[in-house]
Amino acid sequence: MKTGKFIVIEGLEGAGKSSTHQVVVNTLTEFGIHEVVFTREPGGTPLAEKLRYLIKHEAEELVTAKAELLMLYAARVQLVENVIKPALARGKWVVGDRHDLSSQAYQGGGRGLDRHLMTTLKNAVLGDFKPDFTLYLDIEPEIGLARAKGRGELDRIEQQNLDFFHRTRERYLQLVQQDPNAVLINAGQPIELVQQDIRKAVQKFIEENV
C-alpha cells in the first residue's frame, strides 16, 4: 500500500485557513483522493484538546513562553504519533490546520524564544518527521487581526499586540523561503484569486507526487 501525504495549512489569524481547507479537500477529491484525515494543532486527540484549552484560554497564573511551547509540543507529539503517522501508514492523506511551522513562527518569532531551543525541541519531539507540502497563507497582520476580530472574541494568543504578529510573520517568511516543500500564497488578494492560487499549488503537488 502507498503511504499517504501530509499537507499543512499555515498562516496568521484571519489568513483564511478554514476556506483554504475546503479548496484543498475539493482539489484532492478531483484527483480521486477520498481517504483524507483532518487535523488541527494544538488538538486532535483527547489529551491534545485539553492542552489546546490551556494554551488558548486565560489561566489563573502567568503562562510563560517556555511553558506554552512545551504544551504545544506535548500536544503535537500526541497527534503525530497517535493520529497522523498511523493514517499515513494506512495510505490516507492528512490535511492539517497548523503544524510545527506555527511554533517556529509564533514562539520562535513572536515570543522570541531561543532558536537553539526551538531546533533542539523540534528534533527531540519530531525527529525527521515533517509535512510533505505546506501552504503558507501570507497576510498583513493588521488585515488578518481585523478579520479575526470580526469572527468574535479573541483567544489568549490572538490578543497579543501587533508587534508580536509582525515578528511572527517575519519568521514565517524566513522559514517558508528556506523550505522547498512550502508555497507562499498571497492571502491579501480577493478570495477568488486566493482560492485559484491554492488549487494550482495543490494540483501541482499532486501531479508531481502521485
From Swiss-Prot:
GO terms for molecular function: ATP binding; dTMP kinase activity. Pfam families: Thymidylate_kin (PF02223). It catalyses: dTMP + ATP = dTDP + ADP. Transmembrane segments: none annotated. InterPro entries: P-loop_NTPase, Thymidylate_kin-like_dom, Thymidylate_kin_CS, Thymidylate_kinase. ATP binds at residues 11-18. Keywords: ATP-binding, Kinase, Nucleotide biosynthesis, Nucleotide-binding, Transferase. It comes from the Bacteria. GO terms for biological process: dTDP biosynthetic process; dTTP biosynthetic process; dUDP biosynthetic process. It is an enzyme of class 2 (transferase). One of its GO terms (cellular component) is cytosol. Its EC number is 2.7.4.9. Phosphorylation of dTMP to form dTDP in both de novo and salvage pathways of dTTP synthesis. NCBIfam families: DTMP_kinase. Belongs to the thymidylate kinase family. This is Thymidylate kinase. The gene is tmk.
